[in-house]
Amino acid sequence: MSGYEEKITSTDPKTRVFKQDTPSEGEFHGSAPCTSLPRPLPQSLPCTSDLLPPKKGQVKDVIGRVLEKSTKDSLRRSLTEGTYLGKEIFYLGNAWPGGSNQTDGETEILKTLAPDIFSRLRAYPIIWIFELGAGDSTKMSILLDLFELEGIKCYYCRVDINEELQKKNVRQLNKKYTYVECSGLLGTFEHGLAMAAAQAGKKVITSLGSTLLNLDNSQALKNLRGSCRDNNMVIIGHQGPEAMTGRDGEELHRASYHTKEYNKFIRGALRTGNEALGKEVFKAGEWEIGCAITPKGPWSHDFIFYHQGEERFRAFSSKKFNEQEVSDMFKTVGAPSPEIHRHPKTAMRIYVADCLGD
């Protein structure tokens, strides 16, 4: 693939897409390397009440104003200091667009994998499934449907920061299921993992769509370490870099990051930003959104926010680790080597590890 500059027609704001095929590691097209690392979202220490699971149909808020304040502070730093802007602001008021090649690949894997996972879990008297970054729960429903069909009770807790999406999906899931008790936790992955650790029974920690590991190496390891504890079964979906560098990379790259729906999702953060700041900082016509690719170490895609042609900050970085890199992460956190289930066309993989085995 050769480098190119392209402009995609859109509104509020315009979208400008940059891509370069062979920059050096850490270098971005059209500007100096970005060295500002994301600051971690402030965590309120879990108190006893925060660790109590939500009841069926409930969405329990354990972060509330902490998230609102930290998002506003992070946005202000990005505007004034040019620091990296984390992903929270994108998810707060916007639903993930869905329909990507990652979704297609994971769905195909889960159709085959879910019966095997179910057979391993069904004998446990208490089963908890915590999904980190649950979206609309469509993919996880492939597994939940089996519990319902066999009349085996389990508890399913969605962990997400989008309150509207949480309430909507918890309500819909409880209309669908009788044996699967569905609830929601309005909080970060760290909150979800702390709550999971406090529950009795067999816990399944799952995160699909590359959500858990799609971060810089240190944060990905932190998420994985928190997931691979006690007797947890871990189910993680992650797309490898060859999806973007192989024969169909050009097409898959566009399908992942440059669709009309995805563009709407990214632009939605600007509206959320205006609401958080209490004024119209992101004015239509003044801001453009570009992208930059680092092809290795690992493969990375970042969005660049320009104000009147000048780069102001970068955001929503997406990392793609290969099989060996992910396997090494499991080894680093002291977890068993994962099973790897593949969908070659989309380079999606689902990694499964049972932390205590059978």
Question: Which residue ranges define each predicted feature?
Answer:
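Rossmann-like AdoMet
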Residues: 2-130, 137-185, 197-202, 347
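A short, conserved alpha-helix within the catalytic core of class I
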Residues: 213-229
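Substrate-binding/catalytic lobe of Class I Rossmann-like enzymes that use SAM or dcSAM, i.e.
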Residues: 248-336
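A conserved beta-strand element that flanks and buttresses the S-adenosyl-L-methionine
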Residues: 206-207
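Conserved SAM/SAH-binding loop
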Residues: 185-192
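Short "lid" loop at the C-terminus of a central beta-strand within the Rossmann-like core
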Residues: 190, 239-245, 293
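Conserved beta-strand signature within the Rossmann-like core of class I S-adenosyl-L-methionine
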Residues: 228-243
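Core SAM-dependent methyltransferase catalytic element
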Residues: 346-358
